[in-house]
Amino acid sequence: MADKKRYEELINILDQYSYDYYVIDNPTVEDAEYDQKMQELLKIEEAHPEWVTPESPSKRVGGEVLEGFKKVAHDTPMLSLANAFNQEDLADFDRRIRDKVGDDIAYMCELKIDGLAVSLQYENGKYKQGATRGDGTIGEDITANLRTIRSIPMKLQKDYSIEVRGEAFMPKRSFQKLNEIREEEGQMLFANPRNAAAGSLRQLDTKIAASRNLDIFLYAVADFGEMGVETHSAGLDMLETLGLKVNKERRLCNSLEEVYAYIEEWTEKRAGLAYDIDGIVLKLNNLEQQRQMGNTVKSPRWSIAYKFPAEEVPTKLLDIELNVGRTGVITPTAVLEPVRVAGTTVSRASLHNEDLITEKDIRIGDTVLIKKAGDIIPEVIKSITEKRSGSEEPFHMPKNCPACDSELVRLEEEVALRCINPKCPAQIKEGLIHFVSRNAMNIDGLGEKVIIQLFSQHLIKDVADLFFLSKEKLLELERMGEKSVTNLLASIEASKQNSLEKLLFGLGIRHVGAKAAKSLAIHFDTMDNLKVADKETLTSINDIGEKMADSIVTYFANEEVHDLLEELKRAGVNMTYTGPKLEDMSEEELVFAGKTVVLTGKLEKLTRNDAKALIESLGGNVSGSVSKKTDVVVAGSDAGSKLAKAEELAIPIWSEEDLIEYLPDEGGLNE
């Protein structure tokens, strides 16, 4: 019969095996020996459940099913980093540092792991709690799921009570295996390892998290000063002595030239790593100098993240397809041999227009270089002409629309070819998708696949038909059950009460965006007033130029538009502006009157569009760039160059919470 001493001995042995294998990558035993000792441990725990502690290696395999994720407050905020995109940005950062603390400085440079920021709390050396970064102040409790990561020790080498920060991630090989399994099971594939890691750590079933083979690198303590060290580099060394996994590829740099060399080295070597990185993090090494530099609302002034330029990858151009947009513009799209770019698999990319294809001499069958603009949108950069075999085919735009066969035209001062047939089915379908979108009529449950079904089965021919759909007809569609149909019909009904600007934007009048639609709705109050307005009246309104005014007059001169509006009226769709009018609001309510506000980074409680609409409703103007005329910058998480410029110009910087304090208390935002 086993005694407790043997049980505790097994825990220590298995912990050491895990440290050797997962942390320092130096396995000291065969898998069979590890498994044999784990089975011995499990048998003892089955016989003596009262001995089991949260630090037991058996807890790493998962099994606990969680009810949800509690909120966790970070005692020390988990700040995000400002971004640098070139040497000029880094030189500006370096200048600000030197202006404040002098020239006796060094930077600790570390790989920027592309994963999920987390915090680990240890109490008397034992793992107590793990949490996500969240908004930097409040995160989610993912203690059980982080426990399944084998490289996170359940006990430190010393009995410290500390909060450690790091990046949880999914290695490339684990990501590939996971997607292979999901493909075999007919499940949706993860776009990239970062999304897979984040999704794994938010699983309520910890067994799923345990099966995902996640890893972690630790890079900071909430307050390194508490550990008796004077530099960040010494702090990282101490983390290693505690048994925590720290990335080995860090380097202490004594000049910007050394920083540039480190960046250049890892720009070239990043593809060979077993995990994704998306940049390099610079940290002022001296902790006292860090304290002198201080922090902004969202980021430390003593650290910055250099983001790698967009990755360029070669692949084969298999074909060029033509897509018809809602305004009739014909856009050529490259069909590519699937290739991995910046963390996702790319098989299609925009070619923009015929002139660009001709200018770049892009041919079907070419080997082409592609990248993601802003690491998001795939685009073809150029053909690699030296790889041509002679079988490649030059591309020529057709003379007729691929959807309705109408003759294509090129309007004055436009490079794009356009189908001007108002009954073109492709334009109508794209227009319907736009009409139901969030910024327009915001009809939930009416995605592209449902619209395509409705259109192909002749249940709708224009946007007005949406409001006359019956439950019986909707139930006949694929993947539309009783609950889905009920929710969809309720959403359609609710959309009838939208204020006029939502309808105006949804109608897709050429050149009229969401902001102009709001200005028109406020000025004219009703659709009837707007549709008889002349060009002179329209151009007298802020945000409405001559080109837009011409487009509006032309739109409402169309008899088919009059018929459409009558159908929408018959369906009960509101055609009046129901929002607040500036002239009816007091000075106290117009808290942003005459103010220019810039939004940057990710907001947690508000969408970017909601924040913009609320600021504008209170008299403010939302701009896309920071200048001396900017009054306030609202910075969410991962704010970049706009935040840095605001700091440079000494413009007031608000957090999202600061913004919410100035907004009317709608929807519990101020709770």
Curated annotation (Swiss-Prot):
Residue positions of the active site: K112 (n6-amp-lysine intermediate)
Keyword Magnesium: yes
InterPro entries xref list: BRCT_dom (IPR001357), BRCT_dom_sf (IPR036420), DisA/LigA_HHH (IPR041663), DNA_ligase (IPR001679), DNA_ligase_CS (IPR033136), DNAligase_adenylation (IPR013839), DNAligase_N (IPR013840), Hlx-hairpin-Hlx_DNA-bd_motif (IPR003583)
One Gene Ontology term of the molecular function aspect: DNA ligase (NAD+) activity
Residues that hold Zn(2+) according to the record: C401, C404, C419, C424
Signal peptide: none
Broad EC category: ligase
Keywords: DNA damage, DNA repair, DNA replication, Ligase, Magnesium, Manganese, Metal-binding, NAD, Zinc
EC number: 6.5.1.2
Catalytic activity: NAD(+) + (deoxyribonucleotide)n-3'-hydroxyl + 5'-phospho-(deoxyribonucleotide)m = (deoxyribonucleotide)n+m + AMP + beta-nicotinamide D-nucleotide
GO biological process, one term: DNA replication
Record: residues binding NAD(+): D31, A32, E33, Y34, D35, S80, L81, E110, R133, E167, K283, K307
Top-level taxon: Bacteria
One Gene Ontology CC term in the entry: cytosol
Cofactor(s) the record lists: Mg(2+); Mn(2+)
Statement: the UniProt record of this protein carries the keyword Plastid: no
Pfam families membership: BRCT (PF00533), DNA_ligase_aden (PF01653), DNA_ligase_OB (PF03120), DNA_ligase_ZBD (PF03119), HHH_2 (PF12826), HHH_5 (PF14520)
Stated name of the protein: DNA ligase
This protein's encoding gene: ligA
